């Protein structure tokens, strides 16, 4: 049920953007950090595929951030990839005295890395009027 409304809403957004004369770009969800026995594992299920399907059906540009981020996180490995996420050791931060292990939300370093992957995707699409305005 949720999948259908997700797809329906994506199509609605794409249609509305095109109606206004703009160029929509769909982006698959960024990967969460999930390793099983040291091997990176996807945790988004069908959502990235729905985005790809809508992009194809609606003839819309796509940045596959799920694939790009999964590759980057996997290459970093189980331990080193933690620096990209909100990991706080117990006793090091008064706001979270017991520490925190968050494999969904990014640290500043991780957010910058994910943003660079989006920029990479925009460059690959080679959109005139957009690419030349990118700083990196």
Predicted ranges, named:
Residues 29-136:
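Catalytic His-Asp segment of secreted/periplasmic serine-dependent ester chemistry enzymes
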